[in-house]
Each structure stands twice: as structure tokens, then as C-alpha cells.
A protein has these predicted regions:
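Context-gated lysine
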Residues: 8, 12, 25, 69, ...
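Activity-critical C-terminal alpha-helical subdomain
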Residues: 127-227
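Glycine- and acidic-residue-rich phosphate-binding/metal-coordinating active-site segment common to enzymes
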Residues: 73-173
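Generic detector of well-ordered alpha-helical segments enriched in charged/polar residues
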Residues: 2, 6, 94-98, 151, ...
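Charge-biased C-terminal accessory regions appended to nucleic-acid-, cytoskeletal NTPase
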Residues: 1, 214-274
Length: 274
């Protein structure tokens, strides 16, 4: 983001803004919402190309892009997004990340944790990033989701609209228990009994709030692999203006936060259409 955005005060709605340093041409550092970058980083065309958003698959990237557009519109920011969505291909995402990290383009990378419990170990893909520092470093931003995968933080109203019959009676889709949606496997589904086993496996009591409930009742339905795709079809059918109604800053706080991250990286250019 350029100086004009800072001057208009719009930077308050973003995670950060870029300040180009014309004195130290090599500097590249992040501090309290400011990414300071020496002009040398923009002398090569690679440094001025649209930023890359690296995710495990294209559909994840498309969903984050939709979230970023919706975030901008919710803040009445009439600017567009320019993002090059790239797919890492699951476990090979780390290889793609490493190549980008050696390059000259600015990029952000968001991956699933695949954790089924707060105390669980990271999944196979996320484990490969053990040595990578989260947050800002040099030309990139990196984050492992604070939940199982992207399906766990899709806007509540979107999932409710797309799968209203399927989620009926399932506890994590009751607003009272929505926080427990974070680690349940939406693809495989989870019963109360299975949640207890997961607690025992990891030596925790995360799901203990459901201890008095019959174990054969559903915590989360089995969506299979099509939930994200179905949600994306519905999301794409909405105008950006109407999409705002399906995102709640309180219920969907993790989604809104990530949408802000992606919007901060890709904002610029012509205004969004409503």
C-alpha cells in the first residue's frame, strides 16, 4: 500500500502499510503495522508484481480472496485486489514456499494445521514448516491456521445457508457452542463419543462441556470433501455488497482477521464493484 493510503488514514483498517525508504535502499523490516522497504526492493520488476497468496490448494486461495473483497467492502474501501493465487499441492506446499522465499516477490502463505484438538500435533503439511517463523519476515507473511482447516472458520451464516438441513441438531453449529467448531474434522464428522476419545488421546478436557450428552449424538456432521466448494459456489453468487450480510465480526472473528490479512497484502488498483 502506498503513501496516499496512509495520508487518508485508511491504514487503520489494514494489518500494515508499506513505507518505502529512500535512504537505506536495502532495509526490509516490520514493526508495529509498518513494513519498511528500501527502494532497491522495487527496482526489479519482481518486487512490483502483484503479491502471491500461497495456499494448499486453489479453492482455499479463492475463499480467502472472497473474504478479502468482502472485508474491503464492509469498510467502505473502494479499492480493488490484485493477488496471484498459487497452490502448493498439499504436502508439497513447503517446497513451493521455499522457492518463493528465495525469490524477490512479496507473498503471503496460509496453511491448515490439521489439528483435531488444541493439544494435538500439527499435521503432515504444517510439520514441514516447523523451522519457519510465523508472521512477517523479509518479503513474506506466514501463518498456520489456529484451527483444523479452512472449513472450520468459514462464515457461520454461509455454512448455515449451504448446509441448513445437515447441521440441524449438530452441537458445534449451535451458537452457544460455536467455539468448539475450531478443531472438529468437518470432512469426517465427529460424534460426542469420538470427541471424548480425542480428549483422552491428547490428555485434555477440551470437549468436557459435552460430558453429559449421549455419545452417539453428533458434534459435527460428516460433510465429506465438498463443503468448501459448495460454500464457494454460494459465495460467488453474492454481490460484494450482499456478501457483507453473511459475515459477522463476532461469530466469524478468525475469518475476518484472515480476510484483513489478505486484504492488506493485495489492496490496490481500481475500485470493487458492488
Amino acid at each position: 500500500m502506498g503513501q496516499s493510503i496512509e495520508e487518508k488514514g485508511l491504514h487503520k483498517d489494514f494489518l500494515f502499510f508499506v513505507r518505502v525508504d529512500f535512504f537505506d535502499k536495502y532495509v526490509l523490516s516490520f514493526d508495529t503495522g509498518v513494513l519498511s522497504a528500501g527502494y532497491q526492493h522495487f527496482s526489479d520488476s519482481a518486487g512490483t508484481q502483484e503479491i502471491i497468496l500461497l495456499t494448499e490448494n486453489d479453492l482455499d486461495g479463492d475463499a480467502y480472496f472472497w473474504g478479502a473483497k468482502t472485508y474491503l467492502n464492509s469498510k467502505k474501501i473502494r479499492l480493488g485486489l490484485s493477488i496471484d493465487i498459487q497452490s502448493g499441492g498439499g504436502n508439497t506446499t513447503y517446497d513451493r514456499f521455499s522457492r518463493l522465499d528465495r525469490g524477490k516477490r512479496f507473498f503471503a502463505c496460509i496453511i491448515d494445521s490439521d489439528k483435531d484438538h488444541p493439544k494435538a500435533a500439527l499435521g503432515t503439511t504444517a510439520k514441514r514448516f516447523d523451522s519457519v517463523t510465523s508472521g512477517f519476515q523479509d518479503r513474506r507473511y506466514f501463518e498456520v491456521l489456529p484451527c483444523h482447516e479452512i472449513e472450520n472458520i468459514l462464515p457461520f451464516a454461509i455454512v448455515r445457508e449451504v448446509a441448513k438441513d445437515k447441521i440441524k441438531g449438530e452441537f458445534v453449529f449451535d451458537q452457544k457452542f460455536l467455539e468448539y467448531r475450531m478443531f472438529v474434522d468437518h470432512k469426517a464428522g465427529v460424534t460426542i463419543g469420538q470427541a471424548r476419545v480425542i480428549d483422552q488421546l491428547h490428555g485434555g478436557s477440551y470437549f468436557s462441556v459435552f460430558d453429559d450428552i449421549e455419545e452417539d449424538l453428533g458434534l459435527c456432521p460428516k460433510f465429506g470433501g465438498g463443503l468448501l466448494e459448495s460454500c464457494m459456489k454460494f459465495m460467488d453468487s453474492l454481490s460484494v455488497k450482499n456478501a457483507i450480510q453473511y459475515v459477522d465480526e463476532s461469530l466469524d472473528k478468525d475469518w475476518v482477521r484472515l480476510s484483513k490479512v489478505v486484504a492488506s497484502w493485495g489492496v490496490g488498483g481500481r475500485g470493487l464493484r458492488s
